Amino acid sequence: MSINQYSSDFHYHSLMWQQQQQQQQHQNDVVEEKEALFEKPLTPSDVGKLNRLVIPKQHAERYFPLAAAAADAVEKGLLLCFEDEEGKPWRFRYSYWNSSQSYVLTKGWSRYVKEKHLDAGDVVLFHRHRSDGGRFFIGWRRRGDSSSSSDSYRHVQSNASLQYYPHAGAQAVESQRGNSKTLRLFGVNMECQLDSDWSEPSTPDGSNTYTTNHDQFHFYPQQQHYPPPYYMDISFTGDMNRTS
């Protein structure tokens, strides 16, 4: 593989890191703007063939009041719009069933259940924007789990790691401090942290030769071309000779 290909891969991973950081920041901003409204544990009928979710009466009348809507809207129902943990919009038909005297979400609910793989015992979470009272959010939590779908999404984003595994193209630079070395990789000085028990064997002619067979090095960029911190595990195969 050519040096240009390695350089392109390095740039690609750097862009991916930046995008993940932007998504993480957006997610944090959204969470800070949310105000918890209520939670609804799902019953078997909520995820069954009735294709509807029953909203507890006290929560329905407090947060989604139909009394303020027009008479025809009360009969036909309203469209309630929500955003999920990824910012995807969801629209549900919201109405009052006289037969069961209950407030329900109908159209659109079965698709949400299917996409999120919800089962009886799981919990649906409802939130509202702190400054925009007409903006609602919907999330979910698995049965017996203390973290919500939003928490899980942020956890994956914050722990997403980018790894880079070149096998060539590194050039040694005459710089060493303690058990660390500096390598120059594609024009970027990288500090290499060596294991404490690592040593370089000497040859009869006085030169130092080291052979690494999948030895692990940890590199940290010394320039600001790429967003720090940028962790890379780089494995070298083959022999590299450096003369003193």
Swiss-Prot record:
It is found in: Nucleus. GO terms for molecular function: DNA-binding transcription factor activity; transcription cis-regulatory region binding. Residues 38-144 bind DNA. Keywords: DNA-binding, Nucleus, Transcription, Transcription regulation. One of its GO terms (cellular component) is nucleus. SUPFAM superfamilies: DNA-binding pseudobarrel domain. PROSITE patterns: B3 (PS50863). It comes from the Eukaryota. One of its GO terms (biological process) is negative regulation of DNA-templated transcription. The keyword Signal does not apply. PANTHER family: B3 DOMAIN-CONTAINING PROTEIN OS11G0156000, B3 DOMAIN-CONTAINING TRANSCRIPTION FACTOR ABI3. This is B3 domain-containing protein At2g36080. It comes from Arabidopsis thaliana (Mouse-ear cress). The gene is ARF31.
